[in-house]
Amino acid sequence: MAKEIRFGEKARRSLEAGVNKLADTVKVTLGPKGRNVVIDKKFGSPLITNDGVTIAREIELEDAYENMGAQLVKEVATKTNDVAGDGTTTATLLAQAIIREGLKNVAAGANPMIIKKGIHKAVDAAVAELKAVSKSIESKEAIAQVGAISAADEEIGQLIADAMDKVGKDGVITVEESKSMGTTLDVVEGMQFDRGYLSPYMVTDTEKMEAVFNDAYILVTDKKISNIQEILPILEQIVQQGKKLVIIAEDIEGEALATLVVNKLRGTFECVAVKAPGFGDRRKSMLDDIAVLTGATVISEELGYDLKTATVDMLGTARTVKVDKENTTIVEGAGNQQLIKDRVSQIKKQIEETTSDFDKEKLQERLAKLSGGVAVIQVGAATETELKERKLRIEDALNATRAAVEEGIVAGGGTALVNVIPAVEALLEGSQGDEKTGIQIIRRALEEPLRQIAENAGLEGSVIVNKVMSSDKGIGYDVLNNKYVNMIEAGIVDPTKVTRSALQNAASISAMLLTTESAVVDIASEEPGMPGGMGGMGGMGGGMPMM
């Protein structure tokens, strides 16, 4: 396909036009008084949101050159979302500011490669200063503040803090759509997996249709059990002790299942059989997790164990095992705590090493099941449009909270970025030429989030920026209450990871765009028209001949 090429200033200005169209759409959402953006959907109701990355993903521009610029900034938002889960609007705004100031200097004759060097030098200094002033968070109140600022809703912040308090920092917290109007928190303690009983005759509570066993033995195996003779020796040992049994196996069928059910109905022996969760290698890993949690040994031929020779000391135990039609929950397994910690560390290492998002998600689930439990935030609203918007805000707030727990917090409302300006200015003395220009570009860009938050609230951004710069570190502008306060004491905070990622990703893409000297796009070709339809069939000539 033929290409069209633009060079120099013309190419850069076309890219900048696309950057501005995307950034101007996104930046109106910044801050507590930021507005929403409505996005048309081909199917269903329009989406109303203030989530930067969601808005950016929807933008495709007609002009190919402008679209390239927009796609580059979209990458800033997407990368920040992937790394920190929030701060995408800030990242987009910083990218726009760096590109605007940078292109002015390139047009005036500055060398973009040297400017790029200055930009990276300044960003490194700013990030180092952010890390130095970062405060770690431990208390439930601090976690609630981070969530409340991100979602602009104190109730959401409190809900997330409650969830983290119950399942721990490594616990899984998921966000789901509720069928009711309210937003609620459901917590599942212990390990739960999505496999229920193999026969409804095994239930102990016929009203709730669930089997609840306290202090029962747990047999874990990767074998398919179809012959009762295989497990008869171990069953006899358990019956002698008068204990109940939970069997977790690849499958239990035929004679084996029928015998267990008949014995349960006769009152001879209480047992519930459950299929092992997962598939393939993931099933093996989950069986190992269950074994570690309950203190059992996985009875597997791969490990040299056979069901016929299994003994009671190979079985695990737990305070409670609850099995319903679809789920099995093991609470307070009696496994060795050190072995559980080692298993948790092993899974954390796998999470760090994996590149697959799907694998990462499944490993996170396993980690949560071993280390605490799962919390589900059920999001409710009056209409579907409000429900989608609220769900996106809660997901962002949850990501921001996790980031804050990981790397700590800094002053919010754009204050932290203004506070690191002196560290960037300190580099100016030892720099010269275009490298100095690159440092000054970052120095100016660091003001932009605070300026935009003020302007979205209908205030003069420059006045607010100058006042914050002349105040003590940590003093910022509380837009909602129209006063200057110590941001951290007032609970207006941002996660360090979010602020750092936004700046690093914005600088990375923007500096690359400044070094562009030509842009190449496909020439839009006219699509050939559809061929004409077939001619109509002629009518039948003459009438029927007379007999």
Curated annotation (Swiss-Prot):
EC number of the protein: 5.6.1.7
Entry keyword annotation includes Cytoplasm: yes
Molecular function (Gene Ontology), one example: unfolded protein binding
Pfam families: Cpn60_TCP1
A GO cellular component annotation in the UniProt record: cytoplasm
Lipoprotein found in the keyword field: no
Top-level division of the source organism's lineage: Bacteria
Residues reported to bind ATP: 29-32, 86-90, 413, 478-480, 494
Protein name: Chaperonin GroEL
Organism in which the protein naturally occurs: Alkaliphilus metalliredigens (strain QYMF)
Taxonomy of the source species: Bacteria, Bacillati, Bacillota, Clostridia, Peptostreptococcales
Gene name of the encoded protein: groEL
